[in-house]
Amino acid sequence: GTINSGGIIGPVGGVKEKLEAASRLGLDTVLVAKGTASPPDDKDFSEVNASGLNASELNASEQFINLTQYAKENLSLAVIEVSDLDEVMLYLTGAQLNHKEVIIEENQEYTEIMSSLQNLLCQRIDKIESELKKEGISVNESVLQRVREQQGKSVNATLQGDHYSAASYCFTANIMLRSFYYQEKKPSLNTLWNRFSKLEQDVEALDNDISKEPIETISDLQTYIIVKERLNDVREQIAKFKKLQQDPEQKFYEILSYAEERYFSAQAWMKFFSMNGKKLLLDKEHLQQSCRQKISEAEERQQYVSLYISEFDAQNIKERIDGAIDADKKGEYELCLIKAIQAKGDANAILSVMGVRKDVLVEVLDSKILAVKRVIAENSAEGKFPILGYSYYRYATSLKEEESYTALVYLEYAMEMSDLSLYFPEEKTFLQRISERIFITEDMWWGFVVGAAGSLILSQIFLRRKKKK
């Protein structure tokens, strides 16, 4: 099998031939990727058949041969399905490397700030609905139903303590209402120009504000990345509006609605600059290195994916990489980082499900969730709580049942965003900096301090005795 992100074992072609080769070499046990040794159940057969394959194609497809039975009866081989590298190591060595239960302790500051951010976005639904009522606009049943569905999802997420997902659902509802508002009001093209111009000014002002924020911790860096990405997104919507002069005005309303709510979201995320954390060396040099490293990793994945899917289908990944390269050239390394991470995540998501049957996808997701949890837990324990990585992780778990592929994409983003501290060393303490300059170790420095303190104590004792005499 292939080794995918998070140590997940993915399927490969020619498994039957590989088993036969293993038998000729005298092996008695072979490990294969989960879902490649046994055929799907009847339900999955019907689902695949509904996709357009005829019966002869189904029967000829290797993935529907019971390879476990075939290997046992014809090759005297035991075939064992594995999900990840931990299972592989267990079978090879008998050692359970990651047997401990993974528990993430949610950072209390994160919870408080994200809860506040959620309230801002969710209360905005009521605000927009009030605006509609003042204008005498009645929301039609179709839009209202979709808004209430998003609100319902938000309430459920809140009950589970998942404030990021709750905020995301409210954000979607806000766009729906705002778009309906503009469709009913039908503002003129001149009015639209004025709104976009005002939005453009607001974006530049907020961008100037975040450039003054000190970036000292992983939470600072991820907050900067989040706000920067949203502002860049708004800029893209403004550019799109300027290009689409011949399109129906309804398209303009949708673009404006999304851009305004995206900008509001960027403002809300500024709250996270107040969060504490372990200080790291987040200078331009290290940011540039991490940006270019991620671009390289994303390009590698994109080239690999392009071997299996069309150039058109891989276009989105290529566009993200181009965006990262462009940001790198402009010295916007934080924006470069998020775009490269998204490109790599999109490619990894495709590679993770390539050749995976639908009935096995749930197990792939579970394995990926566990891998992400481990990374988040390890970084959190070191005082480097990854606010965006954790947020994506919670959002992915909320999407798992209904939108499994989207959930997988967000898990890939979470994996990358949760381990950013790997690229940034911890900021050196005062003692470490002094020690480097005078060529003594920290232990020697402390020895000097303890020795000096001891000498001071002894001198005090000596003076007291002398006074008594």
Model-inferred region functions:
Residues 1-155, 165-167, 199-232, 302, ...:
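Peripheral, non-AAA+ core regions of ATP-driven protein-machinery
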Residues 114-130, 281-300, 355-370:
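Short, charge-rich, low-complexity alpha-helical interaction segments
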Residues 148-152, 171-180, 219-243, 317-324, ...:
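Long, amphipathic, charge-rich alpha-helical segments that form helical bundles/coiled-coils
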Residues 155-183, 242-274, 325-352, 403-423:
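Charged, amphipathic alpha-helical scaffolding segments
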Residues 182, 190-296, 300-312, 319-322:
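Long, low-complexity or tandemly repetitive, helically biased scaffold regions used
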Residues 331-436:
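Membrane-proximal extracellular "stem/stalk" segments
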Residues 434-450:
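Juxtamembrane/start-of-transmembrane alpha-helix segments at the extracytoplasmic/lumenal side
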Residues 455-469:
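C-terminal membrane-anchoring or membrane-association module
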